[in-house]
C-alpha cells in the first residue's frame, strides 16, 4: 500500500495552527476518493466510507485519547496530535493504520515518530541485520 504513506506525510506537512482536525480529515477523504479507482475499489457503489471508518487524528495528552479536542477545535502551538488515517478492505480481511504523533508548532509540525520504521522495506532491512 505504497499510496498510503504520501498522504500520511501530507497531513503531517499540512497540520498547522489555525487548522481543525475536520480539515485534516477531509484531506484524507479526498486523497482516498481520488485513489479508489486506481485500486479497483470503486465498484458496486462503494465509497471512501466503506474503507475508512474513523477520523485521521485525535489529541494526545495525559490520556492516550484526550477527549478535550473536538473535530472543530482549532489547533494551537504546543498541541500533540496523532496522524493515523487507516484504510481497511473488509472483504480481504486486511487493513493498515500506522500512527505518527506530531507536535503543532508556530512553523512546521514536528514528527515525533519520524525515526520509527514503518515501510515493509525498512522493517525487512532492519530485521535482516539482526543476528
Regions found by a protein language model. Give the residues of each.
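Active-site neighborhoods and metal-handling regions in enzymes and metal-associated proteins
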Residues: 1-131
